[in-house]
Design a protein with these regions (language model features):
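Short structural boundary motif marking the start of a folded domain
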Residues: 1-4
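Short Gly/Pro-enriched turn/cap motifs at secondary-structure boundaries
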Residues: 7, 18-19, 50-57, 105-109, ...
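Short polar catalytic/cofactor-binding loops
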Residues: 8-11, 34-36
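Short beta-strand or tight-loop elements
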Residues: 10-15, 59
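Residues that act as N-cap/strand-start positions at coil-to-secondary-structure junctions
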Residues: 13-14, 47, 111
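Glycine-rich beta-strand-centered segment in the early N-terminal region that forms part
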Residues: 18-34, 45-89, 123, 128-131
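Cytochrome P450 core scaffold surrounding the K-helix E-X-X-R motif
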Residues: 39-44
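NAD(P)H dinucleotide-binding glycine-rich loop of Rossmann-like/cofactor-binding domains
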Residues: 85-142
Length: 142
């Protein structure tokens, strides 16, 4: 798959990366639309995103693969990335801001400035009927 990989100094390069493969409890989403979030703009403007990172967390797409044990989703489901309620055992689920994550811009996590995104089963949110994929990408779930 292709991805816009941050090179530092406010520069991106389009690179070929391996397609993600879902492990148990994971899904792969084919990205249809990705908004440019203010967080991403600031990460680039102030050069705080690590070299090698793939940004983009406000997006919509279609589930293209499901890992073993996934029950909530099937191939073809339309979703937005992030914002789903985490399981109570996850540290970020404990407290009133359950959607707040402490991961920053990890280089090992490929986000939606790529053609495909790997997600935990609990992360996506279904796109309601009548909402376009372009509109859904703008909802900012997280």
């Amino acid at each position: 798959m292709r991805a816009a990989v941050y090179q530092g100094n406010q520069q991106f390069a389009i690179k070929d990366l391996a397609d993600p493969a879902p492990a148990p409890g994971q899904v792969v989403v084919d990205v249809e639309f990705c908004a440019i979030c203010g967080t991403d703009v600031h990460a680039i403007m102030y050069d705080i995103a690590p070299v090698g990172s793939v940004l983009g967390h406000e997006y919509s797409g279609v589930i293209s693969r499901v890992g073993p044990g996934v029950e909530r989703w099937k191939v073809g489901d339309r979703v937005i990335g992030g914002g789903g309620e985490p399981p109570p055992t996850l540290a970020s689920a404990r407290g009133p801001r359950f959607n707040y994550r402490n991961e920053g811009f990890p280089t090992e996590r490929i986000r939606a400035y790529a053609e495909k995104v790997l997600m935990e089963e609990w992360e996506p949110i279904a796109i309601p009927e009548g909402v376009s994929s372009a509109e859904a990408a703008m909802c900012e779930p997280c």
